Amino acid sequence: MRLFFKFFYLSNEGFDNELCGNFKSPCKNIGYLFNNSRVDKNFNSTFYFSPGIYNLSSSIIIIDFQVGINLIGIGENKKIIITTHKGTRGVISYNSNLIIRGITFDNCKVKKNEFPLYVPETLTDYSDDKLDYLTLNYYIGTGGALQIVYSKVYISNCVFSNNKGRNGGAIFTVLSNITISDCIFYSNQALMRSEDGGNGGAIFFGLSTNAIILKSIFKNNMAITGGVIVQSNSELRVEDTVFAYNQASNGGVFLIFNDSKIESTRCSFYANYANISAIANIQNSFAFQKSCLYQENMASAMGGVFSLVDRTILFVTLSIFNDNYAPSSLIVENHGSGLAMFTNCEFTFSDNFKRQIIQSLFSISNYNFLLLKDSRVSNSKGNVIWCTSNAIIVVYNTTFYNVSSKVINIHSQGYFFSISTTFIECKAEDYLVVLRNGARGILFRNNFIDNNGILMVFTTYNSSMIIIESKFFNNIVRNELIAVRNEYTLQIYNSIFKNNIGKTRGCIISVDQLGKLTSTNNYFINNTSVYGTIINFVKKRFNYWHTDFQCFSTFKNDTIVNNTALVSGAIVYYRDKIIGTKYTCESCLFLNNIAHFGNNINSGFHSFSVIQASKVHSNEHFPALIYAFDQFDNLIRGKNDIRFHVSSCDDIHLTGVTSSTIQLNGVTALYNLKVNSPENHFCNLSYKSNPKKGDVKLPISILNCPQGEEMFDVSYQGKVFQCLKTIETSNIAKTVMIITTSILVLLILLCFGITIAYSKEKVINFGNIVFLILMLFSCLFLCIIIYVSIEPTNFSCQFSAIVFPIGIGILFTLTLLKQYKIYKLFKYSDFLKINTDNLKMVKYAGLIMVPVFLLVLIGVIVYPSKPTFILDLHTKTATKYCISRKYYVFSIVIVVYEVIILLTSCFIAMKSKRYHSTPGTFYESLFNSILIYNYTLVFIVLIPLFYTLQNNPTTIYLIYSIGSSILVFATLSIIFIPKINFLFRRKQIVSTLKKTIETQERDIQRNKDLLIFYKMFLIEKKNNNFNNNPIFNIHETFSSEDEDEDEEDDIGEGIYSLFNHWDQNKRKYNNNQIYPNQIPKQTTNSPSSQSIDFLNNPTIPKNKSINNLPNLFKKPKKKLKSKIISKSANSSPNINNNTINNNNNNNNNNNNNNNNNNNNNNINNNNNNNININTKRRKSMDPSLDS
């Protein structure tokens, strides 16, 4: 056939006329040439476009130009731009041959057809369905730049940008052959949302289209489905093409359906996006991908790269998948029933790839087939293969490296075949291979090396796994390498397990005895676990499939060497009871397998026994030893997860350490157990364990308390009974105090008898017999307390609480009144009326004791003291005390009150100190003061002891007893013993006093002579006009106090006054005058018949006259200085020891006169030397008698 060619030139600067179209005179509009019949269909016409923008007002319509139409751009394609008015398509090719080269189609947008539908006659043999598909579904508004129907089109070096169409934003083809080479498709769109629109953002390859795309770029194209290309019943071959940043709702790059075919070679897919299928959504079609790169493509729902539906076949080889993402499936979402095969592919994820939700790389949810061969998956963070159907999955010679989740996860009755697969350095947070719900799996010559995770292989729910000639080296698992559950079938042949570690349970195999386990010709070497290094039989679970399923296990020709269990079960460990037969291995080699706390075969906790005492005292400590055993009667050693608890029956209260955890040695103890119940009770203690393994009940009975102990309820809430040793007052203390008190009682009675018998004696009468009797009765009451307080009873507690404070109060009160009366009488010089009126004394004592009586009465009535046992559980003793809840408050008030009485007494005693040795008082003031001081000292010591030492009955009794005894003894020894001594040793006392006085007189006379001589010497010196001579005032009584008060005086005045005083006494004596003490004269002159209280007045001897004295002793003519010589230290009258001496000497003189002794000179001299010479004070004084 002969071809004819025509050439036309077009330019924006050209003119449309009959002569245009040549190089020198180009036409402006290509439509002018077609509309004016200048283009002959029998010629191959070529249109050359000069650089410029050609804005078409109507489409370039090419119909039946089978010889050929060529649209050629001159120069750069970017400078030759064909665009159209809004709503106008660029080129329409019907039944033609078209070549387009070097032209840019920009912003061509079509909404409807401008030309009636052309259906070639050759289509009349098509079925009505296809004609309907062609004319109605995809024809209207398609192909913004090109619409190609039943044509052959070759496009090269063109740019399609910003074009829009209902289907096929740039190109739409039907029944055509199209080749696209070296083109760029940029920002084309198919987004019309009317029915059946929005398909193929760049190209729509429709019915019976054969397309080839070479070395092109598709970027930023957009559609509802098929962001770049939609294929429907067409074939496409793509080579060396780049697809980047395209997006769609479904199929970010391709939407391939309706028996289409696509073959992609050396293509790159980068950062494409879709909701479903970031690259291709393939439905009922065939896709072949070779040597392609898929990087960072993303689907928001599923199918990060591919989605397969219906009978689709996908074959991918020699391709790389890097950082693609979809939450459901990063690579393939397969809902079809076809095949998906990946060979020699690499699936990688960079360190920067961080997504929160990753389900899997391959998701299979229908009956289909997946082949992963000669590939590598690395750094995956999700499941690699997820299957929820009965699909067939084959993994051959593939490596899984650093996978952090499951590699195979089959949830239904699928089939998994792994051949020559390697799992290396996977750090799975879960399992690597999982088969569930009847799935079947075979691992043939697989390698598990340096992996770390929970498990490597897991099958459950009637699933089966066969492992043949596989190797498990250097893996670390939390549980075991292989775990099978619930009617499983696990068969392991000719495999090696070496240097694996199980961190928490077993190491190699974990089974639940509800399946079939076969191990033949395997090697288990240097593996380590906690329990059951080789096989760990865990607790059985519910049988989901058959209730009569039995376990069958076969172990044959295995080699088990150098395996270690950190706790127990170096080879086998049963966590639950044995259901089937025990582990036995035929023709197996066991060598150097070690369990640190067990044997080669052990089981978990199976039973326990308890050792406890069968008879104890109530609330007595006793231990219970518990031993835990496994099913092989070995102690459960090395565990601490078994807890035991003991409980008692209702009528016995149990305390102590009632719960405990098993120790590493398999034994635990419940320490300090105590059962509390009255005597002779019986109970069964129930011991329980957790995990529960049946109760152990042991009888225990409550014994009677041993001798010397009693049963007490030691709890504030009751029901806690304990035998305690009763602490009583020491027998030695009782004996000693009873003897001591008895002696004191005898002394009291003796004193009482003597007081009554000698009541008229002055020494008794002077002390006030009522006072003495009351004191004796108070002492007797205190002694009675000692007898009564031996044993705490209701009476003794009340009696002691009443009598003790009242008794010591009476003693303190009487001594206070006595001392006060003595002080008052001497202070007002009424000392001669020393006897206190009895009625007044009783009255005053009663008034002082009223507060004590009231406080004791109120305290005893409101808070009565009762005997109560005080329990000390630390020492296991019970001590009986007299206790009142708040009586101590009243007792403190009473103590304070009585301390006030004592302090007042002490104060008065200190004020009365100068009256202690007053003559004629029998030293009542002195002895009473001493008694007060003793009372105070004893009471101050007794009170703190009484309130602090309350923890022992012996101590309390001794405080009462010794305190009372000391008070009684002090009273008797200070008040009564001196009087009794005076009554029965009167002569001896008088004789002793006489000798003492005579000795004192001689000493005084000698000293006085020396002083007078010295005085005379000084006077003589003074008369000789010596200057600065010391002048001494010599007091004739030699009182230190007088020396301090006297002024310097002349010695002559002193001597004159002395003899003048003697003369006055002489006259009084001769006239039978008696001193104011009104002591009657004695009728006899015998010393023995005279009372010790009677003292004669001193006299001046008659044979001595004052006139006969030397001049030195005469009264000087000058007037005497008035002065106060001395104040007595004892009383207001000037009565002192010198006076006593003088009186005694006078008595001696009288006796000597009656016996006609001539010793008057000596007597007078003695009297002269010992008489006080204070004349002024003497006039107001009366002599007193001294005892």
Swiss-Prot record:
Q: Which GO terms describe its molecular function?
A: G protein-coupled GABA receptor activity
Q: Subcellular localization, per the record?
A: Membrane
- Give the domain of life: Eukaryota
Q: Which Pfam families match?
A: 7tm_3, Beta_helix
Residues exposed to the Extracellular side = 1-735, 790-796, 865-888, 947-955
Q: Which UniProt keywords apply?
A: G-protein coupled receptor, Glycoprotein, Membrane, Receptor, Transducer, Transmembrane, Transmembrane helix
Per the record, where are the segments of Low complexity compositional bias?
1125-1174
Is the keyword Lyase assigned to this protein?
no
**Induction remark:** Up-regulated by P.aeruginosa, PAO1 strain and PA14 strain infection.
CDD domains, from UniProt? Answer: 7tmC_GABA-B-like (cd15047)
Q: Which GO terms describe its biological process?
A: gamma-aminobutyric acid signaling pathway
Query: Which Gene Ontology CC terms are recorded?
Result: G protein-coupled receptor heterodimeric complex
Residue ranges in the Cytoplasmic topological domain are 757-768, 818-843, 910-925, 977-1095
Question: What InterPro entries does the annotation carry?
Answer: Beta_helix, GPCR3_GABA-B, GPCR_3_C, Pectin_lyas_fold, Pectin_lyase_fold/virulence
**Principal subcellular localisation of the protein:** membrane
Q: Where is the composition biased (Basic residues)?
A: 1114-1124
Q: How does it sit in the membrane?
A: Multi-pass membrane protein
Where are glycans found on this sequence?
35, 44, 55, 177, 258, 275, 397, 402, 462, 526-527, 557, 562, 684, 794
Q: Which PANTHER family match?
A: GABA-B RECEPTOR, METABOTROPIC GLUTAMATE RECEPTOR-LIKE PROTEIN Q
Task: Return the similarity comment.
Answer: Belongs to the G-protein coupled receptor 3 family. GABA-B receptor subfamily.
Q: What is this protein called?
A: Metabotropic glutamate receptor-like protein Q
Look up and give the organism this protein is from.
Answer: Dictyostelium discoideum (Social amoeba)
**What taxonomic classification does the UniProt entry list for its organism?**
Eukaryota, Amoebozoa, Evosea, Eumycetozoa, Dictyostelia
Q: Which gene encodes it?
A: grlQ
